[in-house]
Amino acid sequence: MARIVKPHMMYTEVHNAAYMTLAEGLVGLGLLKGPAADAVAAGAMTMLMPHGLGHGLGMDVHDCEAMGERSFDYGSIAERAAESGTCVYRAAWRIEPGTVMTDEPGLYFIPALIDKCRAEGKY
């Protein structure tokens, strides 16, 4: 994902590009149904990547507050993620020159989440 990062872009753009890249691979493997864009729009990636793409590095390893996420009420963060179909945690910030951040895309095949989605007929 580092190749697409440009100064002043929103981190959500990078996060969404990671979702799309991973979804395209999963569709190609037959693990997600339909076009990748439809799967992402439907929230399928929250089942397999229920976290942000990465985080900034600073005085604290997970310097979330400096990146626009002022609330550490994880319940409300999870609720917003479910409503938007994306993980919004640690994504509400603009990338500025000199920003240091991690790039941690990853898929987690969590049986409880997969079973829940299957039971609901999703993805």
Predicted regions and their residues:
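Active-site neighborhoods and metal-handling regions in enzymes and metal-associated proteins
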Residues: 1-123
